[in-house]
Amino acid sequence: MTAPLLIVDFDGTVCRGDAPVRFYAARIADALPPAAAREFLAATERYLSRGPASAAAAADTVQAAALREALDSWGAVLALAARCYDVPGPVIAEAFAQCRAAMIDPACEVGLVGPLMETLADLRRDVDVVLVTNSPRDSMLPLLDRLGITAAFDDIVAGAAKPDGLRRLLQRRLGPDLRARPWRLCSVGDHYRNDIEPAAEIGAAAAYIDRFGRADGPATARARRVEDLLPVLRAWAADPEGTTRLAALAGRDGPG
């Protein structure tokens, strides 16, 4: 019998902290005129501080929409650059590549969430733990090596093209009856559309790290920090079919 499957996101889940996002934004700002660069970086900082609520202080309605609609800080930087400052796609992509390269350097502050990693180590006795990230494999694997967590997962799927890439992965791993037996899956992450929706839509357990209290859609449990969701992950791994009890363990509302 195939083991239950725990899908784990990387940015904002396994690792936390805004230093890499600030580096990404700074590299994009290098391509802007000085005044525009200052405005762009200021808008980025507002999002990092207040999330979608930062739209209230936006300079114009386009910026407000970009901030309000961004599902995470990486998306906010991308949306600001593309929608508000017309930064070309190749420039944005190069800035992201430089950011990922910088994260491999020990000098770059990358905050590994230790309690989560300890929990994953325990859960691997009962479930398959798979890291699924949209970041390219050629930069992700060296970063995992730097952090010493390459062996912490049963499988690593980089360049996953979530959310649809995650949906395809679930079909391959769980088979055609994934909707009939959704209890075999739990997904944890901080990007609702990429990490949570593909699980929630088939009735599987979904643990949403909702940093800014967005409440984007249904989830088994949500909390602002992944540490507050660890009891949910442990309970699911211990009794995957008992997912109806999981929301109470997070101390947050479940579906809704």
List each model region and its residues.
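Asp-based, Mg2+/Mn2+-dependent phosphohydrolase catalytic module
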Residues: 1-3, 117-121, 130, 135-256
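Active-site neighborhood of HAD-like aspartate-dependent phosphohydrolases
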Residues: 1-56
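Short, acidic loop-to-helix structural element flanking the phosphoryl-transfer center
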Residues: 7, 101-130
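Phosphate/oxyanion-binding active-site loops and adjacent basic polyanion-contact surfaces
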Residues: 20, 112, 162-166
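An amphipathic alpha-helix signature
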Residues: 21-29, 41, 74-79, 137, ...
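Short, surface-exposed acidic
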Residues: 32-44, 85-97, 151-152, 178
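A metal-dependent, Asp-based hydrolase signature
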Residues: 45-103, 121
